[in-house]
Structure formats: structure tokens, C-alpha cells
Swiss-Prot record:
The gene is ltrA. This is Group II intron-encoded protein LtrA. Multifunctional protein that promotes group II intron splicing and mobility by acting both on RNA and DNA. It has three activities: reverse transcriptase (RT) for intron duplication, maturase to promote splicing, and DNA endonuclease for site-specific cleavage of recipient alleles. The intron-encoded protein promotes splicing by facilitating the formation of the catalytically active structure of the intron RNA. After splicing, the protein remains bound to the excised intron lariat RNA, forming ribonucleoprotein particles, and cleaving the antisense strand of the recipient DNA in the 3' exon. Residues 381-549 are annotated as: Intron maturase type-2. It comes from Lactococcus lactis subsp. cremoris (Streptococcus cremoris). One of its GO terms (molecular function) is RNA-directed DNA polymerase activity. SUPFAM superfamilies: DNA/RNA polymerases. Its EC number is 2.7.7.49, 3.1.-.-.
Length: 599
């Protein structure tokens, strides 16, 4: 039998070559065992693999028998998803809480298999303007597109859809899926997931709209839904754009022609007269903008979306932006059955920062000349600048994490973090390094990146003060205690290979080592099949703990969330530490009576 992933690769190529193709009989791929090994491989390394839904069902205990039960329930129509367990997490920069729906692991497994199938069909047809929850795309690819394509914009329209994920209309979504997939069983299964409901305080609630945030399928279903918005905005762009290289302002053309005339004169002159004309030439070159000044009749619309956040740049008037906003409002209400937030959908002049994906975005308006070595360089007037919102995002991070306090003169004073004192020295420095590197990596595209240097200083001294407070010592004694003689400091620790030292992250090395280019990979997503090691290990029918290799014995996967949390006291813990794996294939007896003997 041909591997399912090889079939999906062919389906993906067909979808790419013919975007109007309609696909049928997809449900049968959910009745093949191999897709569940791939799904498990994708899921088990995630933190949520050990998070329980409403049942005691996690990545632990996965087996061939479990796959057979899943396939049988899908085949005879007896499978119904369990309600998700609702929990709440704090929203960033808000006192409001965001609801998350945690499915059971069996439901996650089936959702992941469905996601793999749907992605092979939809990924090739999604528009390039969409960057959220897609292979080879990220926040950075969205921001790089903005930097590359939004140059010369006069206005920004910052889009916000009210409660997007919570208000996706189920009937509309299934209708959109049915346009591309003619498979009643697959549509019914997706509809079952949407209507599964949720448990909160052990009370069942029905779901009438929305996709549960936390579900495996939710991001892809949201992209399928908002793909209609992408298509609409691109159609709007075709109507709106009125770009012509001839529409250069008379003032720009006159200055440009004058510079050309002086340039021709320079070739014929010598001595003092040439020096005098050269000075005049340089003065006029300074006044010439890097980008041609175009008249207001030159109209261009650009658009980028990441999940439910989108931004539009407009070369045109404010009235044009208001017209675009009204068109969006009507489409989102009539077609998507959702509402564009009037208060949060802002029209911002490009000289002022527009907020998108945690960055401030604005268009440079400066003819300033900068010197780089012996060469004079003009700044790119009209180019896009990405900035870190230091007084907003970074300031809020410092407050939230209690890294520093602000004094009366507005300067910052680093302080210790009380809630970290019970952690080990190694854990404390690891937390600080992780936070610092995370922020530096995310804001690596910003032109004011070096201003994070002060933030790095606050992080370092907050870390030192936290360790000093833990040991009830002074800051200077703590620095002396952990210095290595070269001026750097770090926490010593020991592993099997010998003594090691974890240094505090050096700011100059915190930025991602990968070159930030303006190119987005256009390589197709391959779904080629290669039997994964986990499938091989299960099918080998050999217990990796006791060595049993009985064909008639049931074998399961024992799963842990983090290998580093294992103490190494039990035989199975030593086996997992030695293999440095989160999974161990064991026989039924070992799993129930050796590993889970105390449960």
C-alpha cells in the first residue's frame, strides 16, 4: 500500500498546479494507520502533550491497539469528539483573560491527522499576503514583507476584527470547505469538532460559533475562513491601484533634469570652474529625494495579514483610506458574519507609528546625509522603518516581570525577583538568558535594536541581585564569586563530561545569527513519506526496558514532558536519560506494573 504521506504530496502538487481543483474521498486517508504515527510524531514533543483534557488521556500509552480503536470508531461512525476543557490565560497588556480549549489527546491526534490532510490541499492556494500559522512563514516574514513593499506609503489602515476566533460562523466555514472538498464524511467530522462544546467548572456548554483557541485544527480553519478576506482585499487592490511612472511631480522632474544638465557640464570643465560647478551639483543632489515624488493621483494599496491581525498601506488620500475601511467593514459583516472594530481599526499617517505584531512601523521622512567612512550616504527617504516600542512593550515587560523599578527621574533601577529565589542559580541564569535572547531575537529586525543594550544591562543586574538575594550576600561579592578571571561571569555546574559554566548572555551575541533577508522561501511544502523512527520502534515489538520481544504482547509508548525533570532513581528513568528521549517503547506489563506502579 502506498504511504499516505506520499499520496498527500501528490495531492499538494495537484492543488498547486490547479487552484480550482475540487478534492474528493479524503476521509479514507483517516482510516490508514501510518498517518497517526506521523501525527503522534508531530505532537508528542510539544509541552501540551502531557496536558489533560476532560479525560486522563495524554501522549503516554500510545500504541498500535489505540490506532486500531480510533480507525474502527471513524469507520463505523461512532467517534464523537469530547468537549474541550476550558481554562484561561492572561492576555498580553490587558487584565482580561483569554479562553483556551484543551482537547483530549485522542482528539488532538485525530485533529492533527485532519490538519495534515487539509494543509496539503489549502497551503498551495493560500495567498502570499498571509503569514500566520503556515509552514516557512512567521511574524518575521510578515514584517520583512512590510519593510520591502510598504515603502512610500502615505497612510496605514490597522485592521482589527472583533473576537475573530470566537465568532467564526460554523455554517459559513463548512460552506467554504465544501467548495474545495466534496467529502461529506470529512465535512461532518470537522463540524463535530466545531460543535463539541466545552466544560467549565464541570458544567457543559454548547458552542454556537468560533474555533476553540488551543485546538490543533483552529489556526488552519481560521486561515481557510480569512482566506476569503485575503482574496477580497487583493481584488480591492486591483480596483484601487493606479500606478504610473509618468506621474512624477513637476518639481521633482525639474530638479532631476537640472542635475543632469550640470552633470554634462562637469565633463567639459577643469580647475576652479569645475570645483565651483561640482559644489553646486552636490548641493542639488542633497535636495533630490531618493524616491521620486509622485502626485496624489498615483494610488497603490498593499496588504499583509498574520492570523487575525492585518495592516494595509495606502499611497493615496485619507479619504481613500476611509473608503477602504468602509469596504472592509461591509465585506466582513456580510460575507464573514463578523464585525470590524470601529475603535481599533485605525487610520494612521505613515509619519506616525502604526502598531503591527509588536513593532512600530513608520515611513522615513528625512533627507539627512550620513557619512559611512569616506563615503557620503543619504538615508532612504520614503523607506519603511521597523521600531521597537521601548516605552510600551519593553517597559511593560520590565514591570510585569519585576526586573526593575522606575525612579522619580524616570531612570530604571534593577531589582531582584523574589519569586525566583527558590530556584537554583543555574535555573535563575537560564530564565534570564532565555528571556533576553527571546526579546532580542524577536526584535532583530528593528532599526533601533541597539537601544535594547540598556534593557540587557537591567536584565544582567536584576539576575545578579536575584542570585545575591538568594545567598543573602552583596552584589559585589556575588560578582566576585561567579567571575571566571576573564571579566565574564557565569554559574558553574557539572555534567558527565566534566565541569561546565553557563555565562550570562552577551548582548552582542543575543541577536539571531541568521541573516535577515527580504526573501521568503517559495519552496513547496513537501509531504514526502519516510517511516519515522517511532513507528519502527513500535513495530519492532521489543520492550526497551525489559527486552521482551513477544509478538503476542501489547506494546505502548511511555511519554514524559521533559527528560531533564527525571531524577534517574528508577530503571526506566535511567533508560530515558541514557537515550535522551521523551519516549520509551515498553510492553504492557512494564508500563502498568513497573513505570506506573505507584499510580
Amino acid at each position: 500500500m502506498k504511504p499516505t504521506m506520499a499520496i498527500l504530496e501528490r495531492i499538494s502538487k495537484n492543488s498547486q498546479e490547479n487552484i480550482d481543483e475540487v478534492f474528493t474521498r479524503l476521509y479514507r486517508y483517516l482510516l490508514r494507520p501510518d498517518i497517526y504515527y506521523v501525527a503522534y510524531q508531530n505532537l508528542y514533543s510539544n509541552k501540551g502533550a502531557s496536558t489533560k483534557g476532560i479525560l486522563d488521556d495524554t501522549a503516554d500509552g500510545f500504541s498500535e491497539e489505540k490506532i486500531k480503536k480510533i480507525i474502527q470508531s471513524l469507520k463505523d461512525g461512532t467517534y464523537y469528539p469530547q468537549p474541550v476543557r476550558r481554562m484561561y490565560i492572561a492576555k498580553k497588556n490587558s487584565k482580561k483573560m483569554r479562553p483556551l480549549g484543551i482537547p483530549t489527546f485522542t482528539d488532538k491526534l485525530i485533529q492533527e491527522a485532519v490538519r495534515i490532510i487539509l494543509e496539503s490541499i489549502y497551503e498551495p492556494v493560500f495567498e502570499d499576503v498571509s503569514h500566520g500559522f503556515r509552514p516557512q512563514r512567521s511574524c518575521h516574514t510578515a514584517l520583512k514583507t512590510i519593510k520591502r513593499e510598504f515603502g512610500g506609503a502615505r497612510w496605514f489602515v490597522e485592521g482589527d476584527i472583533k473576537g475573530c476566533f470566537d465568532n467564526i460562523d460554523h455554517v459559513t466555514l463548512i460552506g467554504l470547505i465544501n467548495l474545495k472538498i466534496k467529502d461529506m464524511k470529512m465535512s461532518q467530522l470537522i463540524y463535530k469538532f466545531l460543535k463539541a462544546g466545552y466544560l467549565e467548572n464541570w458544567q457543559y456548554h454548547k458552542t454556537y460559533s468560533g474555533t476553540p483557541q488551543g485546538g490543533i485544527l483552529s489556526p488552519l480553519l481560521a486561515n481557510i475562513y480569512l482566506h476569503e478576506l485575503d482574496k477580497f482585499v487583493l481584488q480591492l487592490k486591483m480596483k484601487f491601484d493606479r500606478e504610473s511612472p509618468e506621474r512624477i511631480t513637476p518639481e521633482y522632474r525639474e530638479l532631476h533634469n537640472e542635475i543632469k544638465r550640470i552633470s554634462h557640464r562637469l565633463k567639459k570643465l577643469e580647475g576652479e570652474e569645475k570645483a565651483k560647478v561640482l559644489l553646486e551639483y552636490q548641493e542639488k543632489r542633497k535636495r533630490l529625494p531618493t524616491l521620486p515624488c509622485t502626485s496624489q493621483t498615483n494610488k497603490v494599496l498593499k496588504y499583509v495579514r498574520y492570523a487575525d491581525d492585518f495592516i494595509i498601506s495606502v499611497k493615496g488620500s485619507k479619504e481613500d483610506c476611509q473608503w477602504i475601511k468602509e469596504q472592509l467593514k461591509l465585506f466582513i459583516h456580510n460575507k464573514l458574519k463578523m464585525e470590524l472594530s470601529e475603535e481599533k481599526t485605525l487610520i494612521t499617517h505613515s509619519s506616525q507609528p502604526a502598531r503591527f505584531l509588536g513593532y512600530d512601523i513608520r515611513v522615513r521622512r528625512s533627507g539627512t546625509i550620513k557619512r559611512s567612512g569616506k563615503v557620503k550616504k543619504r538615508t532612504l527617504n520614503g523607506s519603511v522603518e521597523l521600531l521597537i516600542p521601548l516605552q510600551d512593550k519593553i517597559r511593560q515587560f520590565i514591570f510585569d516581570k519585576k526586573i526593575a523599578i522606575q525612579k522619580k527621574d524616570s531612570s530604571w533601577f534593577p531589582v531582584h525577583r523574589k519569586y525566583l529565589i527558590r530556584s537554583t542559580d543555574l535555573e535563575i541564569i537560564t530564565i534570564y538568558n532565555s528571556e533576553l535572547r527571546g526579546i532580542c531575537n524577536y526584535y532583530g529586525l528593528a532599526s533601533n535594536f541597539n537601544q535594547l543594550n540598556y534593557f540587557a544591562y537591567l536584565m544582567e543586574y536584576s539576575c545578579l541581585k536575584t542570585i545575591a538575594s538568594k545567598h543573602k550576600g552583596t552584589l559585589s561579592k556575588t560578582i566576585s564569586m561567579f567571575k571566571d578571571g576573564s571579566g565574564s561571569w557565569g554559574i558553574p555546574y557539572e555534567i558527565k563530561q566534566g565541569k561546565q559554566r553557563r555565562y550570562f548572555a552577551n548582548f552582542s551575541e543575543c541577536k539571531s545569527p541568521y541573516q535577515f533577508t527580504d526573501e521568503i522561501s517559495q519552496a513547496p511544502v513537501l509531504y514526502g513519506y519516510a517511516r519515522n523512527t517511532l513507528e519502527n520502534r513500535l513495530k519492532a515489538k521489543c520492550c526497551e526496558l525489559c527486552g521482551t520481544s513477544d509478538e503476542n504482547t501489547s506494546y505502548e509508548i511511555h511519554h514524559v514532558n521533559k527528560v531533564k525533570n527525571l531524577k534517574g532513581k528508577e530503571k526506566w528513568e535511567m533508560a530515558m536519560i541514557a537515550k535522551q528521549r521523551k519516549t520509551l517503547v515498553v510492553c504492557f506489563h512494564c508500563h502498568r506494573h513497573v513505570i506506573h506502579k505507584h499510580k
